């Protein structure tokens, strides 16, 4: 005699909601990790992990490209037109978490790929000016 066991999901909507919540929590934890890495990097506690031996103009070009890519990702994904198209691919309930995931990946890439520049790029000598900044 063969016995067949079937697993029935009592409430598929609840399963989808739980999966969306788990996805969102994972995305926000990744954001926390990338933001903490960024804070440590800016504070001088984390050296650039992939610093290349390149000319200063090349390092500046890489850094500018990273900042532009980060800004473009934020700007494009924040637009209503993009969200309308994007929510045809990604469930609307996961749209914000996916935005956070993409931003976290971009921030992590910015930290990981940043190229140090020799010398001071800019400096404020005035104590009042430094306090304002």
Report residues per predicted region.
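Membrane-anchoring alpha-helices and their flanking helix-loop junctions
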Residues: 2-133
